[in-house]
């Protein structure tokens, strides 16, 4: 997977969306946890204030808020990104096991289809 979406201010790549077992959490019945890894690139001529407002949507329904278990790498979070640089991080979403379409929404305008 290497899905990328670009705006004038920044580009977001989701290069991983895989099942994860985030002990000690257990998913709700008929759900499983997925780790989504993101790379955010500043495309502006100055510093970008990036707010990690990320939502997971499965078959038109918003998934529960993301968690950041220790089993993952660094969390994707609010940060400043200098001109020409990137940041990266992961979030973990609880997704219904039978979901046909899963979309990650970053902010208001970026949507990345991950399933």
What is the predicted function of each stretch?
Residues 1-115:
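Conserved functional micro-motifs across diverse proteins
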């Amino acid at each position: 997977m290497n899905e990328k979406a670009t705006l004038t201010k920044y580009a977001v790549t989701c290069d991983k969306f895989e099942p994860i077992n985030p002990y000690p959490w257990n998913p709700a019945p008929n759900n499983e946890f997925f780790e989504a890894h993101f790379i955010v690139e500043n495309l502006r001529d100055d510093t970008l204030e990036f707010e990690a407002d990320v939502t997971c949507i499965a078959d038109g329904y918003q998934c529960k808020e993301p968690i950041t278990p220790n089993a993952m790498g660094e969390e994707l979070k609010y940060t400043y990104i200098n001109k020409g640089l990137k940041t990266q991080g992961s979030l973990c979403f609880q997704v219904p096991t039978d979901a046909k379409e899963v979309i990650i929404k970053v902010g208001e305008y970026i949507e990345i289809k991950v399933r």
